[in-house]
């Protein structure tokens, strides 16, 4: 279920009709995950994963469990960091852009610099995925849905727990947790470390977490919860190689002197802190009040831009994979308050919410080495123009969001209910930089959803909905000519927020302990924000960010999960996705085969498939429990071919991967032991984990597979571990 506000026209219609009494009608909070509630009355496609499911898979990153949900695609980064996409939206973007999905952790709408998700995998209580435009609940960037992660809490962690794991390529994990509970309170604290040397050269990482939660029961109807998560993360290269030939001969991305094959960014040092405080109060009138305050800090340092030229502007072949141009220091603070009042009655339910955010983003980029100023048309070089420690950029953006939202749900006739949501966001951007530039912008955006659910039987329902999502322009898009380091892009302060429109109809049922959910969907994106020269396209003239893009994402999703019998569990997730550009008039590539000139050829990409969207995805997981305490799991993950580029020139073949997990639990007295072993890519299949291209990388005048940036999968991987609970 979900939450939002009252669509006045729907309210007037609903209140004028006689509603049948089907028991209390309820709405679901966006601040907490009501994972125990039935999905039968939902008007949108929703999937949930429990802590037991996440823990039973013994995953190294969130991708390994999210692929069991239809419509989810992820891009795995180094370590346990991933970027999540839903229904192919924003799969064409691969830098640090927002993902088009709202990520909410314990009520905190989290955004990290890279658009990725960093969360302690051992502190997850549940994951809820809402598909379709979800800005009616979560505001900015919920173009295709939301992923809601709730961390562990409650009296069930009133024990001690420790685990150790080892695996391929130096993987090690250590964790210790202790908790306590009585009638008045419960708490736990947990410390963990995940580290590995990595398959690829320089792909080592080390993630340390300290987190905990304290819940105090004020009385029988109210409680207060404080949660904290602190992490230090060090990670290096993603293992990128340049071109198909190097992918075949050098999959480990060992630096062999090809300066163009280096990762654009390296040596990340990330410090994260999440704090939240939630007050919850139940009232006798079937109402609940939630107030959630939070602070989220992200301080990220890294190096960027592989160096190819010395201070005179001359190409230097002696430069290595340690030579980079810029030092980057990015710091953000997200602060906010969310409050919701939910009320449930025999025939209708309401929710009213307030979402206030005060976010600050600071970015500082300095030169690591002296560099020349190089201009084209006519070509000229000024040696030592930029000196070590000079600013490349230094800026601060304050983002303030003032939003109200709500939901109204009404029984219309026997077994038929309708839901209406609406949200209003006022967004204020205020930008300042070291050049004394100051820009401000304001956006007012409405988002909404209307849906219906018909309960055929107690275990079967048909649902349909229409919803919207939006994304507001960023300062770097609005004022690119002034704040961007690239002089070819000019300002466009008239940019408007982009909108996605989601249409969905579905059928869900539970038969003999097996859950079925079938959904047909379409997402239309008109006039979305893109550069006039295309996504990462070259340009030989001025360009700008503009509302000029169009795309359509439509398909079918099927989810089947449950118990075939008490010893055999099944999960099937199938997605058919047809995602293509409906408007993409100009994509530029420099194909003149001369590194000192910039002659661009422009192409029309309208009608082409969205890069990195497979038409077919199928994930199947079978759990078999032949003996008490023993569980054997087999997993198959299939993806059909996709294109790595906007022009649909470079086709990446289909692949099928098999994984296996075995675990055994043994209990004696107050002690519970568990041992497990996991093998990923069981048959050691070679394939590209990521593949992308937007230009003639090797400058040979031909756009082909040698222009790809590729991360080759690490192949067969083993992991094993032992845990004890007491």
What are these regions (language model features)?
Residues 411-418, 522-524, 544-645, 723-725:
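Gram-negative outer-membrane beta-barrel transporters
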Residues 62, 84-85, 101-104, 117, ...:
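N-terminal periplasmic accessory domains that precede
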Residues 101, 106-132, 246, 251:
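Short acidic/polar hinge/loop motifs at secondary-structure boundaries
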Residues 159, 166-195, 200-238, 265-288, ...:
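Transmembrane beta-barrel wall of Gram-negative outer-membrane proteins
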Residues 240, 245, 360-362, 367, ...:
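Surface-exposed extracellular loop regions of Gram-negative outer-membrane beta-barrel proteins
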Residues 7, 216-218, 229, 408, ...:
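Conserved C-terminal beta-signal and adjacent last beta-strands/turns
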Residues 251-282, 393-399, 470-525, 535-563, ...:
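Outer-membrane beta-barrel signature, preferentially recognizing the C-terminal barrel domain
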Residues 184-185, 288-304, 455, 461-467, ...:
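Membrane-embedded beta-barrel scaffold of Gram-negative outer-membrane proteins
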């Amino acid at each position: 279920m979900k939450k939002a506000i009252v669509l006045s026209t729907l309210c007037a219609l609903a209140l004028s009709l006689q509603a049948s009494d089907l028991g209390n009608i309820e709405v679901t909070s966006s601040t907490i995950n009501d994972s125990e509630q039935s999905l039968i009355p939902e008007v949108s496609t929703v999937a949930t994963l429990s802590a037991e499911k996440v823990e039973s898979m013994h995953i190294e990153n969130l991708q390994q469990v999210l692929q069991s949900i239809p419509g989810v695609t992820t891009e795995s980064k180094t370590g346990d960091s991933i970027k999540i996409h839903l229904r192919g939206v924003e799969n064409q973007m691969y830098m640090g852009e927002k993902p088009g999905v709202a990520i909410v952790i314990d009520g905190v709408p989290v955004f990290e610099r890279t658009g990725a998700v960093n969360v302690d995998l051992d502190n997850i209580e549940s994951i809820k995925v809402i598909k379709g435009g979800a800005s009616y609940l979560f505001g900015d960037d919920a173009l295709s849905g939301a992923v809601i992660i709730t961390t562990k809490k409650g009296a069930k962690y009133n024990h001690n727990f420790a685990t150790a794991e080892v695996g391929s390529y130096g993987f090690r994990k250590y964790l210790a947790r202790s908790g306590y509970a009585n009638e008045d309170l419960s708490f736990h604290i947990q410390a963990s470390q995940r580290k590995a040397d990595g398959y690829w050269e320089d792909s080592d990482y080390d993630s340390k977490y300290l987190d905990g939660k304290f819940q105090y029961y004020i009385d029988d109807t109210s409680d207060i919860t404080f949660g904290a998560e602190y992490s230090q993360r060090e990670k290096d290269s993603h293992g990128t190689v340049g071109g198909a030939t190097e992918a075949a001969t050098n999959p480990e991305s060992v630096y062999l002197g090809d300066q163009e094959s280096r990762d654009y960014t390296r040596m990340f040092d990330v410090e994260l802190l999440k704090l939240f405080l939630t007050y919850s109060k139940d009232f006798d009138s079937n109402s609940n009040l939630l107030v959630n305050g939070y602070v989220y800090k992200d301080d990220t340092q890294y190096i960027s831009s592989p160096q190819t030229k010395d201070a005179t502007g001359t190409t230097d072949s002696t430069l290595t994979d340690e030579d980079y141009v810029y030092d980057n220091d990015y710091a953000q603070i997200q602060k906010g308050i969310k409050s919701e009042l939910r009320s449930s009655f025999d025939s209708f339910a309401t929710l009213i919410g307030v979402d206030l955010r005060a976010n600050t983003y600071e970015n500082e980029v300095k030169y690591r080495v002296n560099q020349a100023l190089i201009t084209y048309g006519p070509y000229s070089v000024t040696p030592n123009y930029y000196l070590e420690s000079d600013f490349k950029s230094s800026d601060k953006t304050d983002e303030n969001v003032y939003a109200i939202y709500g939901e109204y749900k009404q029984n219309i006739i026997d077994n038929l209910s309708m839901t209406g949501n609406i949200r209003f966001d006022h967004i204020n951007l205020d930008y300042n930089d070291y050049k004394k530039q100051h820009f401000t912008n304001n956006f007012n955006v409405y988002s909404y959803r209307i849906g219906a659910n018909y309960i055929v039987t107690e275990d079967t329902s048909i649902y349909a909905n229409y919803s919207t999502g939006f994304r507001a322009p960023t300062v770097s898009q609005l004022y690119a000519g002034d704040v961007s380091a690239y002089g070819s892009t000019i300002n466009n302060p008239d940019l408007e927020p982009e909108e996605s429109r989601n249409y969905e109809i579905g059928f869900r049922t539970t038969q003999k302990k097996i859950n079925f959910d079938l959904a047909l969907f379409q997402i239309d994106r008109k006039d979305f924000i893109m550069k006039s020269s295309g996504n990462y396209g070259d340009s030989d003239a001025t360009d700008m960010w503009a509302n000029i893009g169009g795309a359509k994402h439509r398909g079918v999703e099927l989810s089947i999960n449950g118990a075939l019998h008490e010893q055999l569990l099944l999960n099937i997730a199938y997605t058919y996705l047809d995602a293509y550009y409906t408007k993409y008039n100009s994509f530029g590539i420099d194909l003149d085969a001369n590194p000192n000139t910039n002659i661009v050829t422009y192409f029309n990409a309208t009608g082409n498939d969205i890069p990195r969207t497979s038409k077919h995805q199928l994930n199947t997981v079978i759990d078999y429990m032949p003996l008490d305490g023993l569980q054997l799991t087999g997993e198959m993950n299939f993806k059909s071919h996709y294109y790595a580029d906007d022009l649909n020139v470079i086709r990446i073949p289909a692949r099928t991967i098999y994984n296996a997990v075995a675990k055994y639990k043994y209990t004696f007295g107050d002690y519970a032991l568990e041992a497990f072993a996991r093998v990923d890519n069981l048959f050691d299949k070679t394939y590209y984990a990521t593949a992308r291209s937007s230009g003639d990388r090797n400058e040979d005048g031909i756009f082909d597979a040698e222009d790809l940036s590729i991360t080759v999968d690490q192949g067969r991987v083993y992991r094993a571990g032992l845990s004890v609970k007491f």
